[in-house]
Structures are given as structure tokens and as C-alpha cells.
Amino acid sequence: MEKDNYFLENFTSHDGKNLVIHHWPVEKPKMLIHLVHGMSEHGYRYHDFAKWLNKKGIYAYAPDLRGHGKTAGSMEDIGLFSIKNGWNKVVKDLKGITEKFSSKNPNIPTVILGHSMGSFLTRSLIIDFPETANHYIFSATASHPGLKGYLGSFIAKSNSLLFGEKTKSRLLQLLVMGEFNKKIKKPKTRKDWISRDESVVKKYINDPYCMQVFKNQFFVD
């Protein structure tokens, strides 16, 4: 039976915020890879991928970002980075986490792989702190959405002012994610866009960390 090398760690970030990090270590790694998850998911969703990386001699780790997974602290706190400067705080989180593991493993190359929202955060990290990692990978990234993006930003800021930063917004969630399933022919669920593997889709739908409605200030960020 394969030895389970997975464990969790608490990390105190730059402003004192506690972050939960998922680890999949290997002895004498030839590479470190920092997995940055997307919106409405969490680090442990990458467990199978991380175990595959382990077989290649790669040490993988994935934090639950602010407002996500175990870092959120409770289900009610999912869906919000922070009341102020949330995006920048998360970017600094990624910098601090990466530097910690790089310093513990000198002379071993570090890769940051950002998926979806995580790819946007990683792109911000490169702009602000380009020397953080040796290599970067963007998965399911995108270009500027144009008019739709400006409209969404206006709605997010208006909703945040009118209804409060911590109020959940199904409208904004629909604007961000509602188009994805339309590209799937004969979908069986509203989350078929997650994967062509039906078991992965089912697991996502049944994961309470993945099915929460996010809050106005998150969309402002």
C-alpha cells in the first residue's frame, strides 16, 4: 500500500492571518510546486494531481486561500478575501508561502501553478514580485473580458455599497461562472464544465467548500 505522505500546516501570513496549507512532500525533491487554486474550491481538490507529482519527485503544496476551504474558518466566512485590499493581501500571502518553502529547500527550483482565479493571482504576483519563483504556469487563465468586465465591476461596487461587503451575490456569481456550462452539450448537472469525469463533478457538487455563493467585496477585488 502506498504510504500517505499528506499533511496540513498552519501558516501565519504577513498581517497575522492564519492560512491552512496542504502538503504532499517527498524526500530529496527535485522541484517544488506551489498550487494556487481557483474560485470556489480549495487546496485539497488537487490531492490526486499532487500524488501524481510526487511520483515524479516533486514536492507539492497548496494553501487554502483567504475566504476558501479551511482557511475561511467557517462556512459563513467562505467567499470573501478581506473587507479591504483583499486581492493584494492574497498576492502577498502567495509570496510569503513560496519564500518560506524555497528557503527551506535552497537550490531546488520552485514553480507556481495558478489555476483559473489562481492564475490571475499568480499574474499579479509576477507583476509585483517577479523574483518569487523560478517558473510560472497558468492553467485555465483568460484575457480581459472587455465590456462585461467593466459592467461586472460596476455592479460589484454598487452592490457592495448598497447591500454591504459581506452580502452574498448570486447575480455576480452567475456573471462570473454562469456561461461555463453553456458550452457543454447535453449537460447532466450545472457543474459539468468542471470535468469530463463524472465522478469529479459529483465530488465537487457534494463538497460544501465548493458550492458556496461568494460575497460582494470578493467580486470587487
Identify the residue ranges that each predicted region occupies.
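Alpha/beta-hydrolase active-site loop
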Residues: S82-S102
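Alpha/beta-hydrolase fold nucleophile elbow
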Residues: N105-S116
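Conserved alpha/beta-hydrolase
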Residues: R45-E76
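Active-site glycine-rich loops that stabilize anionic/oxyanionic intermediates
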Residues: K30, G38-E41
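The conserved beta1-alpha1 loop
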Residues: H34-G38, D64, H115
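Alpha/beta-hydrolase-fold enzymes
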Residues: T122-Y209
